[in-house]
Amino acid sequence: TYMTLTIGFIGNGKSTNRYHMPFILTRKDKIKVKTIYNRSIHFDTWKKIEGIHYTDNLDELLNDKDIQVVVVTLKSSLHYEYAKKVLEAGKHCVVEKPFASSYAQAKELFDLAESKGLMLQCYQNRRFDSDFLTVQKVIESGKLGDLLELEMHFDYYRPEVPESIHEFSVIDSYLYGHACHTLDQVISYFGKPDHAHYDVRQLLGAGRMNDYFDLDLYYGTLKVSVKSSYFRIKERPSFVLYGKKGMFTKTKKDRQEADLKHFYMPYEHVDFGLDTPADYGTLIYDEEGHYHEEKVETVKGDY
């Protein structure tokens, strides 16, 4: 018999309602959300979901014997503090990214979890991005030969974001907020690099948020570059991959986020998150002197 997992949430904002609940609701036979805590729960703008208990009393959630796992989705600066409370209450914990503001904080939490025999993990849904999964499929096909270079881009034109922030905070920076998606993809697939080089900038000047980063990770002869900016009026391709025998370009990012923003939900639509053929990546390679160019069907992403 398959045990139903009973979980609770600390936080009731965009992360809980856009990135967690739609996928939990497709697995009602396996996962039950019992309680959602938020300090301002009675003023939250998100629609309440039937069958879930909403509370502004944290102890009610932490002391509930039925709840096995708690997901922390509060603002980044509160992740460490609340993950610690969850572990101290004897519950398994999943923490939204960025996980913590320092290595020391993260290590303390993992040590605490281990000492109590608890599972602690960071919520890394971006490992299940369709573009990233498709790049893996292309690499594993061997058609590119030895890999030389991988460029990953996560671009926006949102100058109003850095312009509205007038003080520097590590955990609220663009590097922590967005490189946690792309860097996790690199390290989860390629492992720990031989060495790394980073260029992180504050384009609006000292004391402001970092709003640009360019990170290079080296694996033998392979160089992986992770680049991002808030000031790119035309975004660069999501992935460009070069090997000794060819290249693969995937221009469009994973569709799941766009569908979720439009309330096009996975439990209502079988084509949720699916690319159209126009968005498929292009593979170009040399096979014994013959030029090949083909579209690669996108692997379905699944948060």
Per-range role (PLM):
Residues 245-303:
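C-terminal glycine/acidic-rich active-site capping loop/insertion
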Residues 56, 95, 120-122, 151, ...:
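Hydrophobic residues in well-ordered beta-strands that form the structural core
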